[in-house]
Regions:
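Long, low-complexity intrinsically disordered regions
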Residues: 1-297, 301-309, 316-320, 325-335, ...
């Protein structure tokens, strides 16, 4: 038996960056078309949603990171208008996925009665007739927001003064259960980020409606897992079993047979990568000799959302501190990793100060030995982000280094003075997902 091919950590980083679309040509600023957006969708396969809006809602950022400044309405159109290129479901976390991927998650829909959050399970157990009523309202009158469903129920069956047992919280719980269970879907969002619930025949393109409406049972799950692992493997380029499982939150026992089938078919190649016990390379993955990339990354970008992978490939310790008390935060509230070349070289705590029209950078923390060219690249990306968000670029503080310091931190002060510078679900992800279900008020109930 021949020895497995060895892939260095540096090669693995470059493979991952290329697979995620960071080396594809960028259009001119604000020149991106739906074709460019589709290219990113095809590359990553999943875009995580998050309701935090301190900078911009997270689902918009992966497209900026790969395309540069683009019209945000382009993504809204891909999600909200037929033929939809993106629909919502629980994929990695709450996510935007291609309509063709939605039926592959049927196994998760069937688990809703047992695995949905407690308040959703309770509404099904205690008020099954009410859940059916809410489903009928959506199917007959949708797409509808939660508040519109409430208004429709109020019109059809007005509540007496002593109430007859339902309220907005129950409507929302019923809708979220039905959404999780795949009994209804989403036709997009309002400008206030409220989900527009819809019958299952509304979101998919005509050629995919049958796959949505007539889903095979558990006997088709092995093929579903195969397709999901195939998407993850292509999007990662190279990865461990945990990487491939985490992309769609699959279990190891669901992933292993799929990996074996893909290896047997020649789509995956077993390789040795330092830091992973076992790893697989996608047969069509590019292995660039060098990488010229500059990108500020969403905390929920698919390049960095699996923290063990980030630590293994980049030796970069990254945690989201949104839900960390202020006095315990290390790097800031909304911190974006900065990709330069094939390395993650800095963390930037950013905020869109819409009242003053400024993109604020509260802090920059540089990795040890960050390259000397990184500060100028960061300044370029901050300027591009400010233009994208229709803000002025605000002052940037001198970066503070980690450990023994960095050439980048030493260089940063001079550059900015010229500009007038002044895998498994973590607790942080669960909190974010629960806040997302609450939509605009950040609460489920």
């Amino acid at each position: 038996m021949s020895a497995e091919r060895r892939v260095s950590r540096e090669q693995a980083r470059r493979i991952a960056i290329a697979a995620q679309g960071f080396l594809d040509p960028r259009p001119a600023p604000f020149g991106a078309t739906m074709r460019h957006l589709q290219r990113v969708i095809d590359r990553v396969g999943v875009v995580q949603i998050d309701s935090v809006n301190v900078l911009v809602r997270s689902q918009y950022l992966p497209f900026f990171s790969r395309l540069g400044p683009y019209d945000l309405a382009l993504l809204d159109r891909a999600r909200d208008r037929a033929p939809r290129r993106l629909v919502e479901y629980w994929a990695h976390e709450a996510s935007l996925i291609p309509p063709a991927t939605w039926p592959l998650l049927d196994f998760r829909m069937r688990e809703a009665a047992e695995k949905a959050w407690g308040s959703m399970r309770r509404i099904l157990a205690e008020r099954p007739e009410f859940v059916e009523l809410v489903q009928r309202e959506v199917e007959q009158r949708g797409p509808l927001t939660a508040s519109e469903v409430e208004q429709a129920l109020e019109h059809d069956q007005p509540r007496p003064t002593d109430h007859w047992g339902w309220n907005w919280s129950e409507v929302k719980r019923a809708l979220e259960f039905l959404f999780w269970a795949g009994r209804i879907s989403s036709a997009g969002r309002t400008a206030q980020f409220e989900r527009r619930y819809a019958a299952l025949d509304v979101p998919p393109p005509p050629d995919q409606r049958a796959a949505w409406l007539d889903r095979p049972g558990p006997e088709a799950d092995p093929d579903r897992f195969l397709e999901l692992v195939r998407i993850a493997a292509r999007a990662h380029g190279v990865g461990s079993e945990r990487c491939l499982a985490d992309y769609f939150r699959l279990k190891r026992e669901q992933v292993r047979p799929a990996i074996e089938r893909l290896v047997a078919d020649g789509e995956l190649i077993p390789v040795t990568v330092p830091g992973w016990r076992r790893a697989w390379l996608h047969a069509e993955a590019r292995i660039p000799r060098r990488v010229h990339a500059e990108a500020l990354l969403s905390p929920f970008d698919s390049l960095v959302w699996q923290r063990e992978r980030v630590h293994t490939l980049w030796d970069f310790h990254y945690r989201i501190e949104i839900y960390t008390p202020k006095h315990k935060r290390v790097h800031g509230y909304y911190v974006l990793p900065f990709l330069y070349g094939d390395r993650l070289v800095a963390r930037c705590d950013l905020k869109a100060d819409r009242q003053r029209g400024l993109l604020r950078c509260h802090a920059v923390t540089w990795e040890p030995d960050a390259p000397a060219g990184a500060p100028a690249a960061l300044r370029r990306q901050l300027d591009a982000m400010a233009a994208w968000l229709r803000l002025e670029p605000g002052p940037v503080p001198d970066g503070r280094p980690i450990g023994n310091g960095s050439r980048a931190a030493a260089e940063l002060s001079g550059i900015l003075d010229d500009r007038g510078a002044e895998g498994h679900r973590t607790a942080e992800q669960s909190q974010g997902a629960r806040a997302l279900v609450g939509e605009t008020d950040g609460r489920l109930a």
